[in-house]
Amino acid sequence: MLSLIPFTVCAFLALITSKGGSATPSTISLECSENDVCAALETLTRRQDRLQKTLNLCTDDESQFTLTAVVKCTSVIQVPFPNRHFKMAALDLSSGICRALAQPVVASQAYTVSAEILNEAGWKGVNSGHPGLLFNAIDENNFDFVYLRPHSVSGCYQTGYMSAGVNKFVESKRCPNGPPKGGEWFPFSVTVNGQYATVYRSGVLVTTFKTHFASSRARGGVFIFNGYKNVILFRKFKTAPKHFFSKRCKEVVEFPAGYVKMDAGIGSWPKDAFCQVEFGSDGRIASYELKVDLYNFIGRDKANLGHPGVFFNAEDEDNYDFVYFRPHSVGGCFQTGYLLKGKPRFDGAKSASCPKGPPKGKTWFNVKLTVSNATPAGEVRVYLDDTLVTSFNPRYPIKRRGGVLVANGYKNVIYLRNFKIL
């Protein structure tokens, strides 16, 4: 807040001293020079900004990547400031993985390992090598991995795992946007959710595959292979636990803009129940409010067809209360129910019209639930764009745990943003 003061003061002084002309950056600067205090404040703020940027550069990689194990590498060195990247070389003519593992973080079944990588050299020049990320690391000899081949179009990526120090290779295919180019930085990430891993390069989905090791703690690293004269640079390595968990979804993508895509394009209804995303919460037994913005993108090739909704009072991922909406139905605008052992149940449920009609496709709408334990049976109130839609008694005990869902079997794709449990 304090950083805004000098600019506000300068702009105010410029406006009150100007001769009726419009204030521009140049006139603000000139007028402001008449006031020594304003000029001093501007200078101080600029110095603070430069200091903060320098501090961020100095601490970025060091605070997020601490080497705990380096195995079978010719060298792994950290290039000093201002470059702030690591250089890894595997020049041994024998086989085996040169690998650098990062410091373990908290236990998590969902997390992302990411880094920016540059392939500097290989046996055939800059466009040859095997830069990769490892994850689900139990130790330096047991982990899952995925790497890229800058020299191969048809075998752009390779998945696999190391078990007791022995490499096992699983799948190799093309990348949607081709192999990475040598000599250029590219973002590379693996998002782990339970026993599935999703790989992205430069923000583009490369593949999703089942892992060999179950994710119990978020630990990863960077690697290349010996025998190929491979040298890479890497920077901005991060191992970050995710704030949500998904299940029974064809695809879940988190975008930098702050919204999440959910694709419920698998199976049939009601056999495959819901594609769901659960957000981290404290799980306390207390009254709460659940809020989220939803956007029904498409369902069976129609924007106004779908079943987007929320779940709450979750005992676990297969047992919870829910309510969803039908953009395609005026008379059945909303539907309550509960999930029992992964199966949707509707005994004692409610379905009716909404006071202002169903939500529209390809339009953001807000869903709010107030979940109260003021009475022994509990009470849930459902609001659509701040209008009360219905109220009912929940099936499960009040618990501050929930997320967003969309029914499988309808090729339904939705987006969500601003999820909160208050």
Curated annotation (Swiss-Prot):
Signal sequence annotation: 1-23
Main location: secreted
Tissues where this protein is expressed: Component of the acid-insoluble organic matrix of the aragonitic skeleton (at protein level).
Location in or out of the cell: Secreted
GO cellular component, one term: extracellular region
Secreted found in the keyword field: yes
Keywords: Secreted, Signal
Record-given protein name: Uncharacterized skeletal organic matrix protein 7
The species this protein was found in: Acropora millepora
Higher taxonomy: Eukaryota, Metazoa, Cnidaria, Anthozoa, Hexacorallia
